[in-house]
């Protein structure tokens, strides 16, 4: 390890879970967890520092996956695990892309179908509205005719029977 780190306690829960998974007691000692946490944190800092130096030697300021692979090149087990995780990550992202593309295509198809159904429904509603308008107009005409007929009856009866018709 290159330098002593502050007591970070970044991986306390993970380390205690791993200790239990490998046969330790359910609640390991805090000193044990802290010691392993410092070891893991120091190792990660060293790997990242080596990868950064590799990037600087290549005259780059940003780290790439190849820099981490180069830093792990002397440990074939860790390098193999890193490559396996990278390949798995690529598979997952490709599967998500395919899922999103098919989902987008399906939603586009659904949208088009709904739009076509909506157009058909609008046409039906327009036809319904036209028939309703015709019926309303016919109703108005019949109501108008009935009021006209009442008015003509009143006129025919004259002023004598005006009081009777109002009741």
Curated annotation (Swiss-Prot):
Annotated GO biological process:
positive regulation of transcription by RNA polymerase II; RNA polymerase II preinitiation complex assembly; transcription by RNA polymerase II
The record places domain Histone-fold at 10-74
Q: For the region Disordered, give the residue spans.
A: 97-167
In what ranges is there compositional bias, type Basic residues? 152-167
Q: Which GO terms describe its cellular component?
A: nucleus; transcription factor TFIID complex
Q: Name one GO molecular function term.
A: protein heterodimerization activity
What's one Pfam family the UniProt record gives for this protein? TFIID-18kDa
Regions of compositional bias (Acidic residues) in chain numbering: 114-136
Write down the InterPro entries for this protein, in alphabetical order.
Histone-fold, TFIID_TAF13
Annotated keywords: Coiled coil, Nucleus, Phosphoprotein, Transcription, Transcription regulation
Residues modified as Phosphothreonine are 131
| SUPFAM superfamilies, A to Z | Histone-fold
| Disulfide feature | none
> Where does it localize?
Nucleus
Where in this chain does the entry annotate a coiled-coil region?
109-129
Give the protein's function: Functions as a component of the DNA-binding general transcription factor complex TFIID. Binding of TFIID to a promoter (with or without TATA element) is the initial step in pre-initiation complex (PIC) formation. TFIID plays a key role in the regulation of gene expression by RNA polymerase II through different activities such as transcription activator interaction, core promoter recognition and selectivity, TFIIA and TFIIB interaction, chromatin modification (histone acetylation by TAF1), facilitation of DNA opening and initiation of transcription.
Subunit notes for this chain? Answer: In TFIID, TAF13 heterodimerizes with TAF11, but they do not seem to form a heterotetramer like TAF6/TAF9. The 1.2 MDa TFIID complex is composed of TATA binding protein (TBP) and the 14 TBP-associated factors. One copy of each TAF1, TAF2, TAF3, TAF7, TAF8, TAF11, TAF13, two copies of each TAF4, TAF5, TAF6, TAF9, TAF10, TAF12, and three copies of TAF14.
Additional free-text comment from the UniProt record: Present with 2100 molecules/cell in log phase SD medium.
Q: Which family does it belong to?
A: Belongs to the TAF13 family.
Task: Report what the protein is called.
Answer: Transcription initiation factor TFIID subunit 13
Q: Which gene encodes it?
A: TAF13
């Amino acid at each position: 390890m290159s330098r002593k780190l502050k007591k970070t306690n970044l991986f306390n829960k993970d380390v205690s879970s791993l200790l239990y998974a490998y046969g330790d007691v359910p609640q390991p000692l805090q000193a044990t967890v802290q010691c392993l946490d410092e070891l893991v944190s120091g190792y990660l800092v060293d790997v990242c520092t080596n990868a950064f130096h590799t990037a600087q030697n290549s005259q780059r300021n940003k780290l790439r996956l190849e820099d981490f692979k180069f830093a792990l090149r002397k440990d074939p087990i860790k390098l193999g695990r890193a490559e396996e995780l990278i390949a798995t990550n690529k598979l997952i992202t490709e599967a998500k892309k395919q899922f999103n593309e098919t989902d987008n295509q399906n939603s586009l198809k659904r949208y088009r179908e709904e739009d076509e159904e909506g157009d058909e429904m609008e046409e039906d509603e327009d036809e319904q509205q036209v028939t309703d308008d015709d019926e309303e107009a016919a109703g108005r005409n019949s109501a108008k005719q009935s009021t006209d007929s009442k008015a003509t009856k009143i006129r025919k009866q004259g002023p004598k029977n005006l009081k009777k018709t109002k009741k």
